[in-house]
Amino acid sequence: MYRYLVVANQTLGGQELQDVFRDRMARGPAQFWVVAPATPATQLITDFGALGGAFPVDPSILPTAAEIRDEGVAVARANLDTELARLHELGAVADGAVGDPNPMTAIEKAIGEQQFDEIILSTLPTGISRWLALDLPHRIRRKFDIPLTVVTAPR
């Protein structure tokens, strides 16, 4: 049975990733371990140019670091649970975990605990993806002797 490490968060549920799951299952017995890095929910507006420039913000209304982290974990958990349910509906053997916010750390942990035949990294498109901006695919290829497939969601 081939074991696949799938690393994704915001792209879980996307058609491109679903197509890869179906392809791997069609090749033969497959087991998927899905890691959803708990990307911090740091969606705060930092450029107020449209409003005439920066303006003072009352710090008491900003989320705390713990709130940002907790929201990121909750989003990753919801995405992961939805994807695992989808995979089970397809008849796949699948499980997973919410991982470290740093995707490389999450991958290292998974590989330290289990053996995989392939890593499937699912990202947002270039220009939006922080993972691509961090050169994550090349870093993974350099560090691990495991085939890597990069799945990029459309714009």
Description of each model-found segment:
Residues 2-64, 153:
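Small/aliphatic-rich secondary-structure junction motif
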Residues 122-139:
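Glycine-rich, Arg-bearing micro-motifs that act as flexible, cationic patches
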Residues 145-155:
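Short, flexible loop segments at boundaries between secondary-structure elements
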Residues 3, 29-33, 93, 118, ...:
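Residues at the starts of beta-strands that form the adenosine-phosphate
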Residues 59-77:
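A short acidic, glycine-rich active-site loop
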